[in-house]
Design a protein with these regions (language model features):
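N-terminal accessory regions of nucleic-acid-interacting proteins
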Residues: 1-55, 134, 202-212, 217-223
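Conserved DEDDh/DEDDy metal-dependent 3′-5′ exonuclease domain
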Residues: 34-43, 50-54, 64-187, 191-198
């Protein structure tokens, strides 16, 4: 019975073969991705970031391969709106700048696999508030298992969201990120914004988010 249930769940999502035939997911262009590593840059974007009611959210950490090694990440924190992605190379000053945003209950943060992120942020003295784990928002499709970002994009938009293991396991603590790292990190924060809006449009997310004063609305120009 358990095996049949898992198979039924799988059939509700596009197959790997189908996904390969879908058009490639279009993320933000490089000129809309801001890499931030100094407090002065934070001050330049403070107004636009702190007034955003919805933020896509993800983090990247330098991988650890040896037993007993301690994870010191996150080394990169990604936030995104519909228009821009912000990639923060973590320092004490940048964490202090981001702390009010992450602890603001009226700024919704959406993403995938955020349980470990919450643990890492707690170690840094930051309590994440109003965070929505999108992997668990597909019950209305008959899917009870967690759905990853790649399958979510395929299901909702019939697009292929590329995931590269070589990039995901690269050194995220390096001072100068490569262009593939920048594009990868931005997409991981931007995609959840689109997924959240589509789930909201389809009635899969309540318009009243607990512990906030927000009443979520779909963008007027959404077709």
């Amino acid at each position: 019975m358990e095996s049949k249930f898992v198979n039924d769940q799988t059939q509700l999502l596009p197959s790997k073969e189908q996904i390969l035939t879908f058009p490639r997911f279009q993320s933000l262009p490089l000129d809309r991705i801001i890499v931030i590593n100094h407090l002065e840059q934070c001050q330049d974007i403070e107004a636009e970031l702190k007034t955003a009611t919805l933020l896509g959210f993800d983090t990247e950490s330098k991988p650890i391969f040896n037993k007993g090694d301690v994870q010191t990440g996150p080394h990169l924190i990604q936030l995104a709106t519909f228009e821009k992605a912000y990639l923060f190379q973590v320092s004490a000053d940048i964490l202090n700048f981001l702390k009010p945003i992450f602890e603001n209950a009226d700024q919704i943060k959406v993403g995938f696999g955020l349980k470990n992120d919450a643990h890492l942020f707690r170690k840094k003295g930051i309590e994440l508030k109003s965070v929505i784990e999108l992997s668990k928002c597909f019950g209305g499709f008959g899917i009870t298992n967690p759905v990853g970002v790649k399958n979510a994009i395929a299901l909702l938009f019939q697009m292929n969201f590329p995931k590269s293991k070589s990039i995901s396991t690269s050194n995220w603590s390096r001072k100068i990120l490569t262009t593939p790292q920048i594009e990868y990190a931005a997409a991981d924060a931007f995609a959840p914004v689109l997924i959240f809006e589509e789930l909201l449009r389809l009635g899969q997310i309540p318009h009243d988010i607990p512990n906030t004063s927000l009443k979520l609305r779909i963008r007027p120009n959404k077709s």
